[in-house]
């Protein structure tokens, strides 16, 4: 094969199968000098493997070294695939075409994308119109589309989604998407609305105009604080490394595109960490012992694609540690343990990972910070911890029922969440009310926690419980459980109230604010009342903007939107709203 040799940096060798030994056989790295026919053969083979591989164990990353690629190359992104450029800037790496369609669920004309989960694209330029027909647990970030972006496949069902730090030269068309979060983006125009379209930090004049609820647009003018997700780069002088963007405050628009042009590399606000500062993990050879040893030695971890079965938690004790996954690297708890336990409160980054419950019940999959009466405060003026592109799963993939009490517990103060899907499986293997059991999705006990694009679904009690002060959520999507057998199995407040709210803020909280919420019911198996979709304290510092409840289909229903405010949803397609709560 052509283009396979030693790089100018580090004198490291790429194999004829487009792999580097340091990253293993599930990471492909292409160069503009490679034979385009051979590149396309690899891309086609990966799509053939992964298009329908919803609960498979295979994971892949496809990286493109900086440069412009042959016009014949077209990438399609299937399950557990990540496609990315290796430049510092998206325009450093240019590929002709990238798409994700939704044709695999059947031959009918619906083009159903509601199961197009677990995939991502970042840090490159696509030189044509792009179809990105996806749902939850996906990401498109730091991308330049030199055409239009379609978030649907011919208006088939879709339930996304997340777009961040991206430039779209023409229109972005949401089509049939139920909901979507766009953060720090720019485009020529936005087309489409459905139940809950949320925009944060969009370039001036580019967020769509419309009055909610006639148009389902919720706009948050600026992003108060954000650390963009770190990403793998190849530097011609330094070799492979990870670029770590610095914190931006009160930001609007795309971080790498200013005044109508791409910024220069030297203008980027961040630091390059050489790959030598990372332990490069491989699922075939690494386990909790080798990974914890690396963490104790002060290393960051770069998880290459694969499924890592852990008998003990990975313990993060050092400030500023980075855990970065690629190719939807998956950490699976197999002995009732957590996957990750973070004890330091200072500027930890965890991103690009799928955390999977095992068949022995765990209390948690991720614990950020210690749950104590007096939490250690982060340094004044310091950077937040970042949790980005993090996905959690209970059931669906294993031959025995998966179990957990709750997936995520955030005890630390000053945390940014950026794109979560926390999912108790409603389909797949060993799925049912008494099989894949899980009480809660997300528990927040820390103060000053802000989450963008929080999606939590199908848990057996509250989906989300928030006890910390000054919490903020910008875009929330949630479906209550489909499989409640009967009302008596689904009672809150010590059995006195029918059903569980999806989102509950503790009555002792004084300050909390939310924007763009959509909570949906599909009581498939029984008539089940959910008294209210959201429970909030009635206090001056508690505010909610644009909250809707929808009964998709099935049995009724949702009685109120917030507490005992709003209309009921007792028939298929019924939608009730609260415009403002304060």
Model-derived features: positions:
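C-terminal segment of classical bacterial N-terminal signal peptides
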Residues: 1-3
């Amino acid at each position: 094969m052509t283009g396979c040799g030693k790089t100018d940096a580090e004198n490291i060798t790429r194999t004829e199968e487009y792999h580097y030994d340091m990253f293993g056989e599930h990471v492909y790295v292409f160069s503009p000098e490679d034979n385009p026919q051979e590149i396309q053969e690899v891309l086609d083979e990966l799509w053939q493997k992964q298009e329908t591989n919803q609960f498979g164990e295979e994971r892949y990353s496809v990286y493109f070294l900086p440069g412009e690629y042959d016009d014949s190359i077209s990438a399609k992104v299937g399950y557990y695939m990540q496609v990315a450029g290796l430049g510092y800037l998206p325009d450093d790496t240019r590929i002709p075409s990238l798409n994700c369609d939704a044709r695999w669920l059947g031959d009918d004309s619906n083009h159903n994308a509601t199961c197009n989960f677990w995939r991502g694209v970042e840090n490159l330029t696509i030189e044509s119109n792009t179809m990105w027909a996806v749902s939850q647990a996906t990401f498109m970030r730091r991308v330049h589309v030199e055409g239009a972006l379609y978030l649907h496949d011919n208006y088939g069902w879709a339930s996304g989604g997340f777009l961040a730090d991206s430039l779209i030269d023409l229109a972005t068309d949401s089509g049939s998407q139920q909901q979507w979060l766009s953060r720090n983006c720019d485009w020529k125009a936005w087309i489409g609305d459905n139940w809950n379209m949320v925009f944060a930090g969009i370039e001036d004049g580019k967020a769509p105009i419309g009055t909610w609820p006639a148009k389902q647009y919720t706009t948050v003018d600026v992003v108060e604080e954000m650390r963009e997700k770190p990403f793998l780069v190849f530097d011609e002088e330094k070799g492979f490394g990870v670029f770590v963007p610095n914190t931006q405050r009160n930001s609007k628009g795309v971080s790498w595109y200013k005044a109508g042009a791409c910024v220069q590399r030297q203008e980027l606000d961040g630091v390059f960490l050489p790959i030598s500062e990372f332990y490069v993990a491989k699922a075939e050879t690494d386990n909790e012992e080798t990974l914890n040893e690396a963490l104790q030695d002060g290393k960051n971890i770069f998880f290459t694609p694969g499924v890592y079965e852990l008998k003990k938690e990975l313990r993060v004790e050092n400030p500023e540690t980075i855990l970065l996954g690629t190719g939807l690297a998956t950490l699976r708890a197999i002995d009732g343990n957590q996957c990750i336990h973070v004890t330091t409160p200072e500027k930890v980054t965890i991103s690009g990972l799928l955390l999977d419950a095992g068949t022995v019940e765990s209390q948690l999959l991720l614990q950020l910070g210690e749950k104590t009466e007096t939490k250690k405060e982060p340094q004044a003026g310091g950077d937040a911890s970042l949790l980005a592109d993090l996905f959690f799963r209970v059931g669906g993939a294993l031959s025995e029922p998966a179990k957990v009490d709750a997936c995520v517990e955030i005890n630390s103060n000053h945390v940014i969440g950026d794109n979560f899907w926390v999912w108790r499986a409603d389909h797949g293997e060993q799925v049912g009310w008494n099989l894949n059991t899980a009480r809660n999705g997300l528990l927040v006990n820390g103060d000053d926690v802000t989450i963008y694009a929080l999606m939590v679904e199908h848990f057996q009690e509250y989906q989300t419980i928030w006890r910390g002060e000054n919490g903020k959520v910008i875009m929330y999507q949630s479906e209550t459980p489909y499989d409640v057998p009967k009302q008596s199995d689904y009672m809150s407040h010590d059995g006195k109230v029918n059903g569980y709210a999806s989102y509950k803020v503790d009555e002792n909280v004084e300050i909390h604010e939310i924007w763009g919420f959509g909570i949906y019911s599909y009581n498939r198996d029984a008539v089940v009342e959910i008294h209210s979709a959201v429970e909030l304290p009635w206090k001056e510092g508690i505010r909610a903007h644009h909250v809707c409840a929808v009964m998709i289909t099935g049995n009724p229903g949702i009685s109120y939107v917030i507490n005992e405010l709003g209309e009921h949803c007792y028939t298929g397609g019924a939608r009730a709203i609260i415009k403002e709560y304060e």
